[in-house]
Amino acid sequence: MPHQQMLILFGLLPVATNISTWWNFGSMLLACSSMQVLTGFFLAVHYTANINLAFSSIVHITRDVPYGWMMQNLHAIGASMFFICIYIHIARGLYYGSYLNKKTWLSGTTLLIMLMATAFFGYVLPWGQMSFWAATVITNLLTAIPYLGTTMTTWLWGGFAINDPTLTRFFALHFILPFGIISLSSLHIMLLHEDGSSNPLGTNSDIDKIPFHPYHTYKDLLMLSLMVLMLLMTVSFLPDIFNDPENFSKANPLVTPQHIKPEWYFLFAYGILRSILNKLGGALALAMSIMILLTIPFTHTSNIRSMMFRPIMQLMFWTLVATFMVITWAATKPVEPPFTMISQIASTINFLFLIMNPIAGWIENNIMKYN
């Protein structure tokens, strides 16, 4: 019976023949999610959510717990792998017009917001210098909200500064949010298979479909194998490549690091935040850098779905990718010229893409009409 169910699930799932490797990142994200939950559970068993013991408990996990170093590194580097996959997944959705499947896109964007919140809470848990100060800076942005800001910040912290109650609730949130992510991922997949996935040409996939198994399962397995290989290579040879040197010191509220910054996968949002000198303006720009993805399905005006046949939008898309990388790089630098100016220019171009999206569609439609 289970074998028959598997056949129904995979064998009879009709999928477009021409979907490329860029469509594999969904299954890779599922694998990353499973690994994060498993490694996270084993870490939670040994972790102590107390400001005096949290840092020591991480040291204990890496030194004394059998294979604890592997669990800790898999969890930390797995998070980076998760974000690499999700950013590629979103880029593919933008490039090939997958956002026109509105319900799937909106549930996916909600998933991204939940994932970013989970990763942020997780970054605070080791209670190192950068964990503490990144948490202080980011949560302090809530004070920019008029009238309610200070009350909300005090409520989130559980006091008048980041302390033991903050760490306890961040651990609780970091533990519970992945279950919400799993539930929403299931909904995301269900909504996707309501209409079926798109394809690189942006045409109706119903014309030419093949069973998911064995054709696409083997293609997925190849990419999964490559991802696991990269992950294990990084864990084995470069385990601290994504770590900040400041985070190897225990949190000290009396000593501020020279340059406070979050993990690399938040640097683009942090760079946009820093490029605006006003606190409320920066906080709004930070929120909009993610929330603006929600508007994309409603600003598509072109008669063509995929960017494969849209040269103007291709140019804009790759400009967006370049600005994303430039903002990420600039955010690692101190807040001084020329990095401030670079961040401001790149942030402006970043938001211009989303304003130009409907305009480029109208231009392309008119060019095709007159030809």
Curated annotation (Swiss-Prot):
It is found in: Mitochondrion inner membrane. Heme b b562 binds at H75, H174. Pfam families: Cytochrom_B_C, Cytochrome_B. The keyword S-adenosyl-L-methionine does not apply. It comes from Eryx miliaris (Desert sand boa). GO terms for molecular function: metal ion binding; ubiquinol-cytochrome-c reductase activity. Its cofactor is heme b. One of its GO terms (biological process) is mitochondrial electron transport, ubiquinol to cytochrome c. The chain crosses the membrane at residues 25-45, 69-90, 105-125, 170-190, 218-238, 280-300, 312-332, 339-358. Binds 2 heme b groups non-covalently. This is Cytochrome b. The cytochrome bc1 complex contains 3 respiratory subunits (MT-CYB, CYC1 and UQCRFS1), 2 core proteins (UQCRC1 and UQCRC2) and probably 6 low-molecular weight proteins. Gene3D superfamilies: Cytochrome Bc1 Complex, Chain C. The keyword Heme applies. Heme 1 (or BL or b562) is low-potential and absorbs at about 562 nm, and heme 2 (or BH or b566) is high-potential and absorbs at about 566 nm. Signal peptide: none annotated. Belongs to the cytochrome b family. Keywords: Electron transport, Heme, Iron, Membrane, Metal-binding, Mitochondrion, Mitochondrion inner membrane, Respiratory chain, Transmembrane, Transmembrane helix, Transport, Ubiquinone. Heme b b566 binds at H89, H188. It is a multi-pass membrane protein. Component of the ubiquinol-cytochrome c reductase complex (complex III or cytochrome b-c1 complex) that is part of the mitochondrial respiratory chain. The b-c1 complex mediates electron transfer from ubiquinol to cytochrome c. Contributes to the generation of a proton gradient across the mitochondrial membrane that is then used for ATP synthesis. InterPro entries: Cyt_b/b6_C, Cyt_b/b6_C_sf, Cyt_b/b6_N, Cytb/b6-like_sf, Cytochrome_b, Cytochrome_b_C_euk/bac, Cytochrome_b_N_euk/bac, Di-haem_cyt_TM. A ubiquinone binds at H193. One of its GO terms (cellular component) is mitochondrial inner membrane.
